[in-house]
Amino acid sequence: MAFSFDPESKGVEAGWALALPSSLSMPVPASFCDLFTDKASREYCGDFWYETSFFVPAEWSGWDIVLRFGSVTHRARVFVNGVEVAQHEGGFLPFDATVTNIVRYNQFNKLSVLVNNELSETMLPAGTTRTLADGRKIAAPYFDFYNYAGIHRPVWLMALPKERVLDYSTRYRLTETGAEIDYTVSTNGPHPVTVELYDGTTRVAESSGTTGTLVVKNAKLWNVHAAYLYDLVIRIHEGSAVVDEYLDRIGIRTFEIRHGRFLLNGSPVYLRGFGRHEDADIRGRGLDLPTVKRDFELMKWIGANCFRTSHYPYAEEIYQMADEEGFLIIDEVPAVGFMQSTANFLAANQGNGRQQGFFEKETTPALLKNHKAALTDMIDRDKNHPSVIAWSLLNEPQCTSAGTEEYFKPLFELARRLDPQKRPRTYTVLMTSLP
C-alpha cells in the first residue's frame, strides 16, 4: 500500500482521502516502525495514511459490500472514493464498514485509511502524548512495551447476502452418553435457521431454530494438546434455497474452578505457560503466520499448555491455531498502564505532587466507557473459541485507591453478562499498586 506521514494533520482538509500527494510503499499487515532506520520515522507519533485500490465485480451488485479490518492501531478513519465510511478507536480488535452504496461496480475503488497512534489517559492502553518545542509529538506510554502502530492484521473485502447470520454462541454439558451443546443464533431476517454438527463428512447432530440443543453421542472432547474439533454449520433457508451458510470449528469441552483447581472436562489441569507478546523483529506487531507457528512449537517444546494474551487481544489466527494445537488462553483486554505512580513518573508528575488515584480523575468516565467497549468487542469475537478459558480484565492496575471498586465492578459484571459460557474473570495484580 502507499503510505505517508501527516505530521501537520492536514490530510483530510487537503483531500488526501482521494490521493496522497507523495508516498512510500508499505507492506500490510505490519507495523511501520521497525521498517525505517531513521529515528524520526521509527518513533513518529501523529497522523499517517495508507492508500490502495480494490476492484468490485459487477456480479456483487445486490449483495452487501463490507470492508473488515483485523486491527488498526490505535485510531482509524476509513475513506472509500473520498467518502468517510467508518471511524474506530482501539488498536487490537476488528471493525468493519459497509460500503454497498459507496463502491463503483466493475471498476477499481480508492481505499484510504487515516491512522493515529497518539496515546491518552482515556484509551486502552493508557499513556499521554507530548508536543516538543519543534512541534514534533512524542508518545509517553504508561505501559512497558513498544507502541507499535499501523495496520497490523489483514483487511478483507466481503460480499455478504442481505439476510445473513450475524452471530452465534454455545454452551456445553457432558452427559453419560456424550455431550449436549446449547446454541443461540442471531440473524437479521425472518427466515428459518438450521444448525448441524459434522465430524469430518459425517453429520453427528442437528437442530432447527435460532435457539436449541445439539445432542452428540459418544462425543470426542477437546483437551490440552489433544484438540478435537467439529464443524458447526449454520444455514438460513428461504424455501428450498439456502440464503446464507456460516461454518465454524468448535471443540466440546467444559471447565470449572473447584477447590482452588482448574478442571477441564472434569479433570484437573495445572496451567503452565507465559504472558506473551505478538512482537517480532522487522514486522513489529503485524500478523506473521510463520512466526506464530514457531512460537507455538517453542511453547510445546518447553512444556507449556497455556498463555495469556498480554496485554491485548491477539490476531484471530492465533486463537484458531490454539484451538487446533490444544493450548489454553487467558484472553486479555488492553487495559494496561492504569497506575498513577507510573503516570506521574512518565507524564511529568501529573497531579502536581498530590496523591491521586488513577480512577479518581476527570478522565475516568471516558476511560471506563472505552474499557467497556473493548471488553465487549473482545468477548463478542472470542467467546466461541474452545481454547479461551478466562477473561483478563486488567493488567497490574492500581487497586487500592478509593475509586477502584467503582471502576472494577461494572467491568466484572459486564464480562459475566456477555459470556454465555461464564468463564472465570481475572486481573493481574502488582504488589506496588499504591498511588
Where are these regions (language model features)?
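Surface beta-strand/loop "capping" patches
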Residues: 158-189
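Extracellular glycoside hydrolase catalytic/binding regions
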Residues: 398, 406-435
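Accessory beta-strand-rich segments of carbohydrate-active enzymes
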Residues: 3-6, 45-164, 189-190, 202, ...
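Core domains of carbohydrate- and sulfate-ester-processing enzymes
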Residues: 2-47, 113-161, 260, 337-346, ...
